[in-house]
Amino acid sequence: MASTTNGVNGHKASQPQSLIQTLNNIGADSFSNDGERIQAVLAAYALVSRLETPWEFVARTCMGQPALGAALKVAKDLKLYDKWHELGDGEMTCEQLSELVSCDSALLFRILRHLAANHVLEETSIGVFKPTKLSISFTVPVFGEWINHLYDATTPCFFKMPEFLAQNGYKNPVDPNNGVFQAAKGWKGDMFDYYKSHPVEGASFDHVMGGVMANQAGWLEIFPHNKLLETADAQSPLVVDVGGNIGHDIERFRQEHPETASRLYLEDLPEVVKRSKCPDDVNKVGYDFFTPQPIKGARAYYMHGVLHDWSEEPARKILEMQKEAMKPGYSTLLIHDHIAPESLAHPHTTAYDLTMMVMVAGVERREAHWRALLKSAGYKLVRIWRSPLAVQGVIEAELDQ
């Protein structure tokens, strides 16, 4: 007698098709808030891992993903995303697109087909393609420059990582002047010096960092920033953004509290702060955070993504350089960074950790790691602020009296 249950785990054959249809109908607008959407993304990652066979995993990881990166880069170099966008992002045939970007149509079809197979483009019919929200986003530098950065930096570094680690006895990289980045790029000096000497790649890197800042939950969504105003001396500096790049975070604060602009300070190396987008009434200070902090007695000293660039010894020195400027019992240190869980870390956190390792010999720290680092530099951890919308958190610390 034939079985009537020939589906998934013995369920009726019609049920898997219904399940697949349900999955195909799920989109970002299926969720009431971004926290639920993020949880669904993680669940989808886990679902793929449960469904894939070993062969499907290696085919995707070892062929599909490298090929996707290359296809994205070729399309970027051809200015495909930008030129298509200028024409209104409508459906176009492969032949029309090949004329648009001056590329052999047979070659371009192979590129377009892989982009469509990975949902970067939509193939509406045979040989006809349409942009998606994702591909249109590549016309904006904070997304599009990630493709250049992939080939300028991350791919060369990860390609070199196994060889470098083997040659160095599999020791944890801690020297920002002698790591994977230097081996990959043939460079003497740290990554930041490299970008100063290579301004085109440096400008691309700035856009990448802008994308990091702009597309994660900001510190104002994580930390109760109003309490800084409620407890601040109106005549003293309010917030000092230490190593704040061109001012993405301090500008968010200024927009929320415009009356405080003259008491806000953006600090980074002189050549960086001169590119700041902040209004003139925000103070811009050229500052090397390995030297004593020049702005004294601020209510808060804020660091976003600074300390993960550095291993223990330099990170400790950066923290120590802020201490003399801080007013005991008043000044707060705010560290906005990844706080890796002891287990089951978010894949973005683990990816950041390995990226920091190969680029700058940095590290994404666990909570116990942060506590030990702060204590060694003369601070005590007051509280860790988190949000379900963010893989990063804000560590609130003060001087340990």
Swiss-Prot record:
Pfam families: Dimerisation (PF08100), Methyltransf_2 (PF00891). The keyword Transferase applies. It comes from Annulohypoxylon moriforme. O-methyltransferase; part of the gene cluster that mediates the biosynthesis of the phthalide-terpenoid hybrid 11'-O-desmethylfendlerol. Within the pathway, mfmE catalyzes the 7-O-methylation of the phthalide 5,7-dihydroxy-4-(hydroxymethyl)-6-methylphthalide to yield 5-hydroxy-4-(hydroxymethyl)-7-methoxy-6-methylphthalide. This is O-methyltransferase mfmE. It comes from the Eukaryota. Pathway: Secondary metabolite biosynthesis; terpenoid biosynthesis. Its EC number is 2.1.1.-. The gene is mfmE.
